[in-house]
Amino acid sequence: MYISNQIDPEWPRSTGCGPVGAISRATLICNLCALARSRPAMQTLPNSLPTQVTFKGTLEGLRLLIPVALPWEEVVLQLQHRLNAGERLWQGGAVVILEVGERLLDGPQLQAVTEMLTAQQLHLMRVRTVRRQTAVAAAVAGLSVEQQEAPPEENPDKPPALRGLAEPLYLQTTLRSGMSLVHPGTVIVVGDVNPGAEIVADGDILVWGTLRGVAHAGAHGNTRALIFALRLRPIQLRIADRVARASDEPPAAPQPEVAYIQDNTIHIAITTEFARRW
């Protein structure tokens, strides 16, 4: 900003602060006050969306928050700046939970974030997102995923029973050991769920492959939820608050099986028999 040290001799006359001539301190103050009165009042800016990439330390790990509206190029620049800053909130080997909310991220963008974190000896452990596309991209990249529910729709015409239902999450990949997938609806996996992997769903779980990990359907108390797999060999099965595991004796010939609750107990049946019964 440039400020002139000359005072307009017309100001005193126009403001009633004294005759033109030598400028006293009082006259100078009066002139400045007149200038301030002549400027338009500052307006308060409305609340805006977050525009900063931020880290927050928590007990579960280091949360990395990426704003929804920030251009991707700016996300990269800000993240590099935060990671290279002298004062850090972490030590080498810390785990990171990436929180992106409604923002869409594809596979290459997730890979770029992973590589920047890895360069600082940080481990991207989980991605929290509202968007199914981001959840799918993260799972395909081998990352654990927690898909959160979107804000409820303001639609009074929709029946209450249909409001807030999450769409099924469809994945064409294999969940490896250490991966965790959390979704507020039904999960469909075309691939295997290996030992050490976990699926938690509010709805059903369908695995078009071999289920060897942990599966928890109806996680918020839905006792009518089902767990289906072409080969059901899990470490643990959970439906609502019931817990079970597959039999140590595999079927003579591998057949699709389904787990369900009946009489407050988890039962496992061959799919064809279950279909006839239900």
Curated annotation (Swiss-Prot):
The record's section on InterPro entries has: CAP/MinC_C, MinC, MinC_C_sf, MinC_N_1, Septum_form_inhib_MinC_C
**Alphabetic keyword roster:** Cell cycle, Cell division, Septation
The organism's place on the tree of life at top rank: Bacteria
Question: Is this entry keyworded Cell cycle?
Answer: yes
| GO terms for biological process, alphabetical | cell morphogenesis; division septum assembly; regulation of cell septum assembly
Instruction: Give a Pfam family name.
Output: MinC_C
Q: Which residues does UniProt assign to the signal peptide?
A: none
Q: Which NCBIfam families match?
A: minC, PRK00513.2-4
Tell me the HAMAP family matching this sequence: MinC
Matching PANTHER family = SEPTUM SITE-DETERMINING PROTEIN MINC
**UniProt function note:** Cell division inhibitor that blocks the formation of polar Z ring septums. Rapidly oscillates between the poles of the cell to destabilize FtsZ filaments that have formed before they mature into polar Z rings. Prevents FtsZ polymerization.
Q: Its quaternary structure?
A: Interacts with MinD and FtsZ.
Concerning its family, UniProt says: Belongs to the MinC family.
Name assigned to this protein: Probable septum site-determining protein MinC
The protein's organism comes out as Gloeobacter violaceus (strain ATCC 29082 / PCC 7421)
